[in-house]
Amino acid sequence: MSGLARLQRLQKFGFLMVSASANRPIQRYQCSRTEKPQKRTSANALLNHLIFKIKSTGPITVSEYMREVLTNPVKGYYMHNDMLGEHGDFVTSPEISQIFGELLGVWCISEWVSAGKPKAIQLVELGPGRGTLTDDLLRVFSNFGRLLDSCDISVHLVEVSPKLSDIQAQRLTGKSIEVELDSNSPVYKNGITKTGRPVCWYQDIQDVPNGYSFYIAHEFFDALPIHKLQKIKDGWREMLIDIDPKLPDKLRFVLGSNMSLVAKTFVQDDEPRDHVEVCPSAAVIIQKLAQQINSYGGAALIADYGHMGEKTDTFRGFRAHQLHDVLTDPGTADLTADVDFNFMRRMVGEAASCLGPVTQHVFLKNMGIDIRLKVLLEKSNDVTVQKQLIHGYNVLMNPDQMGQRFKFFSVVPHSRLKNTLKTKMPPVAGFSTLLMT
C-alpha cells in the first residue's frame, strides 16, 4: 500500500481518537499593523544594558540585538516569559487545534513505515514552546500502539528557555523536573513522559545523539538572529543599531561604514534585491540536520513564516498579538523574521534532498485534514467541541489567517526520493496530493 493510500485509510477509519485537548481554548490569529500603547515598566534594564554596550563598543548588528533581546539570561524575552496563548504575544498552530499535531504525527509514522520501520525513533523538537505539539505527537504514537510496539521511541527537546522547559516538563511528564548540574552531560533535564517515553532537554541541537530521527521545527527558524544587509553602489553594507543622538534612551537603525563580511559569505553575486536578511544560525542548523538525516535516516519537517528569496524587510516584533516596533521596549516583545527557504535549500546543498515549501493550507489538505475533521465531528456530540474544531480548522486553513502565511518544508535522505526497478518509494505525504479512492 502506498504512503498516501495508507494515510487515507488512517484518516478515513479514525484510528486517531478525540482527546481531551479538543477543549483547548481557541485563539484567533492576528496580524494587525497598529498597536495600542500598554503600560510597561519604565526601568527597562535590557535597554540600559544595550545602550551601555553600544556606548562601549559601538553600534551592534541586528543579529546581536536579537540575540540579546530574546535570550539574554537576565532579561531576555524567551528566558522568563510564557509568551504563548491568550495572555501572551502570539499563538501557534498546535495551540489552536489538536488536528495540527495529529497530522504531523501521522506524517512521522508514514515516513517511518516508508523507511522500513526502523527499530528506534528519536523525536526531536526544536523550540517546543509549551510542549503542546510534542504532546500531540506522542498521543498519536500511542494510538498506533500495535504498529509501534516494537519501536524504541525517545523524545529530545532543544530549548534554551528555563521558563518554557518547566512548562514543557509539566505538560509532558505531569510534574516539575529539576535542572541537572552535571557539567559533563549535555542533558540538563530528563524524565519519563505520561506515555512512558524517555525525554531529555538540551541547550543545543549539536548535543542531540545520533540516530534515526524526526526533527520538528515549528516557528523555530523565524526567531533565529538575522543580519540585515543593504546594497549600495560599491557593495553591501550591514544595517546596525545605534543610539539616537537626539533621544539618548532610544535606538535607531544606521548603515555600517564598512563592506559586510556576512554578505561576502552568504549573498550570491547575482542577488537581484537591494536589501536582504541573512541568518547564519539557520545555515549551521539546517546543515547539521541534513548531515544527520542523510547519515542516520529520518526527516526534518519545518513549518514557519517564509518565502523563496523574494522578500526584503520582514524583521518585526509582536506584543499582545499586535505588531510592535522592534526597537521599542526591548525584551517585552517577540522578534521574528521570515524564513528564506531558498537560502535554506542552498545551505542544504547536496547533503540531502529538500521538499517544498508548500503553504500550510496545501500541506494540511494533502495530509487529509478534511477527512480528519469529519471523523472528529462525527465522534463528538458536544456542540461546543464541534464549534471549536470547526473554528480551529478555519484558522489553520484560511488563506487570510494561517493557511497562506505559513509554509512547510522538509529535508529527507537522498535515498527517500530514489526509485529503482526493485523498489518504488511512495510519495512523501503532505507534499503530494492525497488521492481519494
UniProtKB/Swiss-Prot annotation:
Transit pept. (range): 1-42
Gene Ontology annotations of biological process type: mitochondrial respiratory chain complex I assembly; peptidyl-arginine methylation, to symmetrical-dimethyl arginine
UniProt keyword Ribosomal protein, yes or no: no
Catalyzed chemical reaction(s): L-arginyl-[protein] + 2 S-adenosyl-L-methionine = N(omega),N(omega)'-dimethyl-L-arginyl-[protein] + 2 S-adenosyl-L-homocysteine + 2 H(+)
Major localization listed first in the record, in broad terms: mitochondrion
Claim: ATP-binding is one of the keywords in the record: no
Record's subcellular location: Mitochondrion
EC number: 2.1.1.320
Alphabetical list of InterPro entries matching this protein: NDUFAF7, NDUFAF7_sf, SAM-dependent_MTases_sf
Enzyme class: transferase
Keywords: Methyltransferase, Mitochondrion, Transferase, Transit peptide
Coiled-coil segments: none
GO MF annotations, alphabetized: protein-arginine omega-N symmetric methyltransferase activity
Domain of life: Eukaryota
Alphabetical list of PANTHER family matching this protein: PROTEIN ARGININE METHYLTRANSFERASE NDUFAF7, MITOCHONDRIAL (PTHR12049:SF7)
Role according to the record: Arginine methyltransferase involved in the assembly or stability of mitochondrial NADH:ubiquinone oxidoreductase complex (complex I). Acts by mediating symmetric dimethylation of 'Arg-118' of ndufs2 after it assembles into the complex I, stabilizing the early intermediate complex.
Family the entry assigns: Belongs to the NDUFAF7 family.
Protein name: Protein arginine methyltransferase NDUFAF7, mitochondrial
UniProt organism field: Xenopus laevis (African clawed frog)
Organism placement in taxonomy: Eukaryota, Metazoa, Chordata, Craniata, Vertebrata
GN (gene name): ndufaf7
